[in-house]
Amino acid sequence: MSPYVFLIISISLFLGTSLTLFSNHWLMAWMGLEINTLAIIPMMTYPNHPRSTEAAIKYFLTQATASMLVMFAIIHNAWMTNQWTLFQMANSAASVLMTLALAMKLGLAPFHFWVPEVTQGIPLSSGMILLTWQKIAPTALLYQISPTLNMKVLITLAFLSTMLGGWGGLNQTHLRKILAYSSIAHMGWMTIVMMINPSLALLNLLIYIIATLTLFLMLNFASVTKIKSLTNLWNKSAPMTTAILLTLLSLGGLPPLTGFMPKWLILQELVSNNNIIMATLMALSALLNLFFYMRIIYASTLTMFPTTNNSKIQWPYPQTKTINIIPTLTIISSLLLPLTPLLTTLMY
């Protein structure tokens, strides 16, 4: 891809998200979502391949449907309340419709059908943007209308997402599909606490983005897309194998890693709001995710599939600018649990 084209696409992605984040008018927020959608499609179709083209078309059709529902909810709300202000979603029908539309954009179950297929069909770099940056704008809209959301709808979406995100990833062998189902499950954790404590939902999103970004950068650097390919990664870069292990355990929510923090705080919020049954179900659903993370860890660190090069250590990867930020991101995604009191103080 031409550097100029890549620059234009990157600026468009940034502007689209910024427009949604900083607007207080529904029409401008909707325009930001559309700019985001249209900007990433050329990136998804490069390099040109039938699978990436198919994935881009699936993504476009799904996002266009979600955008249509968003616009319908905006118009219905404006018709009933005479308000175009972003914080005014007083009409309950418009609020439910907006929640479902944003759930489709985020890939929450039962609207998750597009996430694994699209992620599997595009390159790792595009998948990284799709599962991290593209979550920011819809989440910001959910955050801003959080006081008017329907709790029953949120709980249903969140529970389905965590369960289906866990079940869907169990028998997968492709890392991109596993990360797609991981994204669905993490969006479920974020959604269930959105109405109770929106700041905690944003913290969960931030930690998820950092950990997923770290993992995608390492997989892209090693050019690995299948679990089987990870078994020889120790030959090329032993430190990267350790970094992948830590990041996956953090995504799984094991203490004392960073990923344990949002799950711990979310379960604490649910229990304090007398949602004990829901907290129990969410904690059990996290075990499904942990299982397929452990499958990846087992394949990458504890096993060695038959290969022509088992004994020789390969020449290490050349030092690049990309690998320089990986240690920093690994530390952030693994070792921030001691900062929990500080972060909770800032949130409350």
Curated annotation (Swiss-Prot):
One of its GO terms (cellular component) is mitochondrial inner membrane. Its EC number is 7.1.1.2. The chain crosses the membrane at residues 2-22, 26-46, 55-75, 96-116, 149-169, 178-198, 199-219, 242-262, 276-296, 323-343. Its main location: mitochondrion. It is found in: Mitochondrion inner membrane. One of its GO terms (molecular function) is NADH dehydrogenase (ubiquinone) activity. It catalyses: a ubiquinone + NADH + 5 H(+)(in) = a ubiquinol + NAD(+) + 4 H(+)(out). It comes from the Eukaryota. It is an enzyme of class 7 (translocase). It is a multi-pass membrane protein. Keywords: Electron transport, Membrane, Mitochondrion, Mitochondrion inner membrane, NAD, Respiratory chain, Translocase, Transmembrane, Transmembrane helix, Transport, Ubiquinone. One of its GO terms (biological process) is mitochondrial electron transport, NADH to ubiquinone. Pfam families: NADH_dehy_S2_C, Proton_antipo_M. Core subunit of the mitochondrial membrane respiratory chain NADH dehydrogenase (Complex I) that is believed to belong to the minimal assembly required for catalysis. Complex I functions in the transfer of electrons from NADH to the respiratory chain. The immediate electron acceptor for the enzyme is believed to be ubiquinone. Belongs to the complex I subunit 2 family. PANTHER family: NADH-UBIQUINONE OXIDOREDUCTASE CHAIN 2. Core subunit of respiratory chain NADH dehydrogenase (Complex I) which is composed of 45 different subunits. Interacts with TMEM242. This is NADH-ubiquinone oxidoreductase chain 2. It comes from Osphranter robustus (Wallaroo).
